[in-house]
Amino acid sequence: MVAKLIDEDPEQAYAYSKVALRLASRVAAVREAAGFAAYANQKFSEALAEFRAARRMTGNIELWPVMADCERGLGRPEKALDMAGAPEVAKLDKAGQVEMRLVAAGARRDMDQLDAAIVTLQSPELASNSVQPWTARLRYAYADALLAAGREDEAREWFAKAVESDRDGSTDASDRLAELDGVEFVDAFDETEADEAPVAEVGPKASASDEDEPWVEDAEDVEEFYDEDDEEFEPEEKDKG
């Protein structure tokens, strides 16, 4: 159920994962699913704890890249880079290594190291003409890094390549390419009808204090599920800053 909902309704998937944890916290698949549900809701401390638990139970190295990305989400890009250079990366399959490269490049950008991010993404997988499941995302990330570095012509070229390989629409490369080409999208909504339609005001006007504030995860709010078998469990330190 969590896997089915995680893309369409991350919050509901997270709610289901909490129930599953209460019922079967010693099942590795449950811990992993809970980790992805927390990750989809940007609860990075909780996600990292669940991924670590799942890895302890199975010894599976496939979670290494997403664990590193959790470190990025917690504002620790240096830790993510350390993980990108760890021996575990050599044990990943090709897809995992590409994912790790994407995370490392993102960490470089977090640290305002744009040139280093570009170099990190340069690889045989990027240069290959074959289309793999990761190709569109890799080309997109490279194009986006080039654009951030002010290399617009090269960025346009790679956004176009990303469009060619994005068979399932996993990126918005086509929109980014159109934006670079100066294409303007016009809303099909009839503005004259909008002018004629009465505007109903519901409820009192919200004050400045009622406005939404940015969400910040507090490590103290993270609910951990572990037992005496989780010998390596170490509670997450409270995020600094």
Regions found by a protein language model. Give the residues of each.
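Alpha-helical segment of the N-proximal tetratricopeptide repeat
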Residues: 1-22, 33, 39
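TPR-repeat structural position
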Residues: 10-11, 44, 77, 114, ...
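TPR alpha-solenoid repeat register
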Residues: 30, 63-64, 117, 172-173
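Intrinsically disordered, compositionally biased tail regions
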Residues: 208-241
